[in-house]
Amino acid sequence: MSTAKLDFVRAYEKEVQNKWESDKQFEIDALDAPDAEHPKYLATFPYPYMNGRLHVGHVFTITKAEFMCQFQRLMGKRVLFPFAFHCTGMPIKACADKLKKEIEQFGCPPVFPVIEEKPIQEVTTAVKEDPLSFKSKKTKAVAKSGGAVYQWKIMQSLGISDEEIPMFADSAYWLNYFPPHCESDLKLLGVGVDWRRSFITTDVNGYYDSFVRWQFESLKALGKVKYGKRYSIWSTIDDQQCADHERAQGEGVGPQNYTLIKLEVVEPIPECLKEIHSQGKKIYLVPGTLRPETMYGQTNCWILPTGKYGAFEMANGDIFVCTERSARNMSYQQMTTGKGEYKCLAKFEGSDILGAALKAPLAINPIVYVLPMLTIDENKGTGVVTSVPSDSPDDYASLQDLKAKAPLRAKFSIKDEWVLPFEVVPIIDIPGYSNESAVRAYKDLGIKSQNDRALLDQAKDLCYQKGFNDGVMSVGPYAGRKVSEVKKIIKDEMVASGQAVDYSEPTSKVVSRSGDECVVALSDQWYINYGDDDIEWKNQTIKQLESMEFYSAETKKKFEIALGWMNQWACSRSFGLGTHLPWDEKFLIESLSDSTIYMAFYTVAHLLQGDVNGSKPGSAGITPKQMTSACWDYVLMGKPYPEGCEVSEEKLKELKKEFTYWYPVDIRVSGADLIQNHLTFFLYTHAAIFEKKFQPKSIRANGFVNLNGEKMSKSTGNFLTLVDSVAKFSADGTRVALADAGDSIEDANFVDQTAVTSLLKLHTQIQWVQETLDSIDKFRSGPLDRIQDTIFESEINNIIVESEKAYQKTNFRDALHLVFFDLQNARDHYKVTTLDQMHKDLVLRFIEVQALLIYPIAPHFAQKLFNMLGKGNILSAGWPKAGAIDYEALKKNNYVQQTIYNFRMKLQVYQKAKLKGKPAGTKAIPDQSTIIVSKSYPKWQQDVLEYLATIYNEDSKSFTKDNNAIAEELLSREEMKPHKKNLMGFVASAIQNVKESGKDALQTSLSFDETSTLTDNIDYICKTLELTSFDVKDFNEIPQASQSKIQPIPGKPQFQFV
């Protein structure tokens, strides 16, 4: 297949990029003072991790920042878009070590055993979380392929030769290899970055290292960094915390804290536990619960009959009956005799302990029994579940099943006395709802059994939310007090008295990049004190949200939720790549904690470092050691010039000028998955360190991007790197497809065919412009005196206005459709309506305006058009000024277009009926076509529209009454009763029209005459519809007998064919 068009487009793209490079188009420095006419604009994007080439998933987010930057440049702003390369943490080290082990084990190049490799698949947890918490449930396992496949093969999949792969066994090689590729790939896409300010992270770069050390010294001085025992996701292989970016599976997963209730096994002892009991040891079943305050209502304990259980000895001699998986977690939480060590005294199936008698703490029932539950997940909690049927729909459903089904009891040899005597025990009263919330929800939702999973999940959320927010204890020492007040008190008392213990585990499966399934460990570590323990800091950060722009209500809501649950965050690790804690050098700062305010480092990086690695000083002539924390305080905090400083104040002033000019961040663009960690840390740390004027102004979040409707996956081959995309579709073809992929916080979709089509359209448009310019003197000139001129000029000006709004809101897909598709449709319409007699000035205006409007999305194409027009650098032109807009002419034009569309649809119906049974090729052109218009609505419809106008709120763009209230009001009117059948259908149609067109849709008449508008366009309409002529008649002019069959209304004529 010929690649001529692709080659043509890529050739001019390269020319444009070379010109940008030679002109240093995107390099920009601070001014001595702000320029009100040309304000600064700083955009940043989370630096990507340097363990592979960039793919369209990365670039989908990058282009949101890129589009905004190019738009702001056109708006006359001085824009800085810097970019850096993240290398901190375990991923690079883990991959390098893995590769080294493969070479040692299998040779170089390695000869691997022939086995089926099964890469980890992307998963979404099906297990219910605490309804009161907010956790990400999606992981990106496929693209990371932690311990699932050989590292050598992963490197091959990145296009690296077998000769070079061994170099990557040294983690330092990664830091030198991928950053240059990342830069060159983005240059291929035409991204407008000031590359002088780029840097790599870790202590390899002494300048960045000194910056991060200063950051943590500042946080510690402010009391934000503390030391103590904390729960965190832990890699047992690496023997340290496993942060999000160090995971092959489970990104976003955090610890889930449970209370393990100690249900003591009493006589008669099950056979499988008798030997242990004979040794005088106390044996406990240990269900994990999120609701310790409900333990008063225990009626039984659930186990999975086919589940694999063990009796594990704890450090204090207690024996816990649970799954081995949970015992493994306990061994990292100082509950067993040694870290990672757990002694199993017996193994058995759940069926072996059915019917065991238990003494349950707090329970009103003195003895409860072990019963079967078939829906227990052995990979969640301890595999043991306590039963509180008053407030847990799952428990109530399972208990009802056992009570109602004798065969089910017989199947598991369950005695009646273990089940039938036990009734629901009311323990929590929810005013206005029930004191047995699970029973009420079970009945209200029509749940039939424990297998009604979706309904039970719904009921569980309902009961948990109502119980926590509105519930009042009705039993125990705290009767009469709200659940939300006493939940923690009851839990703490149970732990203190030895009736329960704290326990934590990952909310879902986490696999480290070293290949092990992670646990939750309780360990001494440095942590950042996010959350309720520093409520002043938390409230300060929450207050920031009020003054920020988030571009969508959903994004802001996610921040509110994240700030609600965010808690202390472990910020140290034992090894990997990164910066050492200044006051405790044996620890490194983890990868999400060293990347919260690095945007400030961009402002001075080009002066400090002479290259991306910081291996030599930059123009300021300052060494890393000279950049002490006191220097950073002067530059970034406005503190006095430090005594005995090795750097002159003049040099530090130059750094300070850059920082104070560029800060704060005007827009931070990121994937929405980072709201739950990085972006919230970003807000917290800015609030702690910087004064109010340097707080971020806006955050723009987006979802993941799919590829051709499917999740991107190397294992399935549905994967596209940036360099491959540019090679296949060109830079602008890729950019247009990325803009068209979607704008919301939900997942978007990059479509190959869109990229191909975009490439072809760009090529076609270049050809059209060239042909047009070659014959421009043949176009009509003189005054713009035709209605078609007015319409086209107004459409151009209106698109200038509307596309500016779309860009400002970061609605880039809307902007694309306006400036590329709608604008070209307007040109094509102008060409047809003028019968190929377009005006020279308007055609040239169209070409220039389209180039300017599409520049943020397709800058190479735009600059090419400007070159063809002989106008030089497109950025010098700035955003086009919109001239006068004749809205009345646009209304008429839209009316004509809609009428043509409706006419064609109606004509097709007529022709289909006429051609039924006729030979192929027969035509059914009507002898006479009539368009019937009406200047007014029927009286009852006028009344409806006038009423709706009175209850429409312009500010909120909504109606102040709902449909039920509207119906009640209108149906109470005597004159509406004859129209009862059609009334609400008309109301619904009117409301929909308002949503699409605004309050104007409620006007009872048009601002223009339909008859004259149609007759003025008769030639165009006939040509478009292939008619010889048509008539226009007023509704009142047609015979009364025909009026009942049709009902035109203003703006929506009807049609007749004879």
From Swiss-Prot:
Where is the motif 'KMSKS' region annotated in this sequence?
Answer: 711-715
User: Record's GO cellular component, any one?
Assistant: cytoplasm
Q: What class of enzyme is it?
A: ligase
Keywords attached to this entry: Aminoacyl-tRNA synthetase, ATP-binding, Cytoplasm, Ligase, Nucleotide-binding, Protein biosynthesis
Q: What is this protein called?
A: Leucine--tRNA ligase, cytoplasmic
Q: Binding residues for ATP, per the UniProt record?
A: 714
Question: Where would you find this protein in the cell?
Answer: Cytoplasm
Q: Where is this motif: 'HIGH' region?
A: 48-58
